[in-house]
């Protein structure tokens, strides 16, 4: 307090602050997802230098574990030291130069963000538009590829977080290869939640996030590039417009050479957390992780339908880890979500873009994808809807979910 009384030191806050202790929530929205306690413990381990030999060894393990979850042997595989949006920017700023052309598929919010990245690189974005709530149309994509033989890459969102839709990544990558385009995939929500095979499907560049089905803390973005894409980066005619995201520089640190070149101070403790999250996926098994997400999704669907609610997306292209649920016009979206948060400490998401105010986005991602959370969500949502005047039976919804297991 003596320092505050010194007239030469001005404190602009209204009062002295105390340590922040967040409430304990169950996170069943579009992300971030609940963080496994093991990962939180890893985050609190002693910080070491980012060039410490022990840390360098751990970096090599992180790379190998990322290769496992991506199902790739790509040498250029690493976590970008920033959220998934930076992973997206890393891909486009490294692969595109001014005057290039990219075909971008948009069936939700995040295809639009791809377009913005392309144009900020000085490249042309050729858009393939599909209705929100539907998968990317393969025929439209092939028409665009035929009409633009000079396109450098084809980019699409595998699991569109704003709509809960899964597009056919394997078929889209095959089209890209057929027309000699690089295949670029947004896997922010799909990684570890649904089938994803980078090498087998011919994906050239992919980016994800740590805060979805990996159940890690937000702030890192795993990326991977095929040798074909890496060659494009090495042979650029102009420097990458972002110094921080320039992979030609970053790989001096992540490249695995005997001597690591300092590029930036890595987020050491966040990388501990990522390492632990990837170890957890490895322990469970990647296919088992996919199956768990699918199993809990089936249970949630049964319970939601028992409550008389319906889904936006057709079952054939519906994401198991993110569910868009329609609600009656008589229901106040904000009131329901507020009640869930205040009475049950349960977070679900609101609609984005064209779906704002029309749907809930209920996530079952990573550590949050559990039977316990399915039952909690159905019981809590049912109780709140009944308070809002709907004739629903929360217990019957939970029973319907249990019968699917």
Report residues per predicted region.
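PLP-dependent enzyme catalytic core of the Aspartate aminotransferase-like
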Residues: 13, 354, 358-405
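Conserved PLP-binding catalytic core of the aspartate aminotransferase-like
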Residues: 310-343
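Active-site phosphate-binding strand-loop segment of PLP-dependent enzymes
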Residues: 136-192, 205, 213
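A glycine-/small-polar-enriched, mobile loop at the entrance of the PLP active site in fold-type I
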Residues: 24-81, 85
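Conserved active-site segment immediately N-terminal to the catalytic lysine
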Residues: 199-211
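Active-site C-terminal subdomain of aminotransferase-like
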Residues: 34-35, 211-302, 306
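Conserved beta-loop-alpha segment that forms the PLP phosphate-binding cup at the N-terminus of a helix
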Residues: 75-103, 107, 111-115
């Amino acid at each position: 307090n003596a320092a505050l009384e010194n007239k030469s030191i001005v404190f602009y806050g209204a009062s002295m602050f105390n340590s922040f202790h967040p409430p304990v929530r169950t996170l069943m929205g579009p992300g971030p997802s609940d963080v496994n306690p093991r990962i939180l413990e890893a985050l609190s381990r002693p910080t070491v230098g980012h060039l410490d030999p022990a840390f360098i060894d751990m970096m090599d393990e992180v790379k190998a574990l990322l290769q496992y979850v991506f199902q790739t042997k790509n040498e250029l595989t690493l976590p970008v030291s920033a959220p998934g949006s930076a992973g997206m920017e890393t891909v486009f700023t490294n692969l595109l130069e001014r005057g290039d052309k990219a075909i971008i598929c948009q069936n939700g919010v995040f295809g639009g963000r791809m377009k913005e990245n392309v144009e900020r690189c000085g490249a042309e974005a050729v858009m393939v538009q599909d209705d929100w709530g539907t998968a990317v149309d393969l025929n439209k994509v092939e028409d665009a590829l035929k009409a633009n033989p000079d396109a450098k890459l084809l980019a699409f969102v595998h699991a569109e977080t704003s709509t809960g839709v899964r597009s056919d990544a394997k078929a889209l990558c095959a089209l890209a290869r057929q027309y000699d385009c690089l295949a670029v995939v947004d896997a922010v929500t799909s990684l570890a939640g649904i089938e994803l095979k980078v090498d087998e499907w011919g994906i050239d560049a992919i980016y994800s996030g740590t805060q979805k089905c990996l159940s890690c803390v937000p702030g890192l973005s795993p990326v991977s590039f095929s040798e074909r894409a890496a060659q494009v980066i090495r042979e650029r005619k102009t420097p990458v417009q972002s110094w921080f995201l320039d992979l030609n520089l970053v790989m001096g640190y992540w490249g695995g050479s005997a001597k690591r070149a300092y590029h930036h101070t890595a987020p050491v403790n966040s990388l501990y957390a990522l390492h632990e999250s990837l170890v957890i996926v490895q322990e469970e098994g990647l296919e088992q992780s996919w199956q768990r997400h699918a199993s809990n999704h089936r249970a949630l669907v049964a319970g939601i339908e028992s409550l008389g609610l319906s889904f936006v997306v057709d079952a054939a292209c519906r994401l198991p880890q993110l569910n868009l649920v329609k609600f009656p016009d008589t229901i106040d979206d904000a009131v329901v979500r507020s009640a869930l948060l205040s009475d049950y400490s349960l977070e679900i998401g609101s609609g984005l873009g064209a779906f704002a105010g029309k749907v809930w986005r209920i996530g079952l991602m990573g550590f949050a994808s559990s039977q316990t959370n399915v039952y909690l969500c159905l019981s809590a949502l049912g109780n709140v809807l009944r308070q809002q005047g709907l004739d629903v039976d929360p217990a019957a919804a939970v029973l319907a979910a249990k019968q699917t297991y």
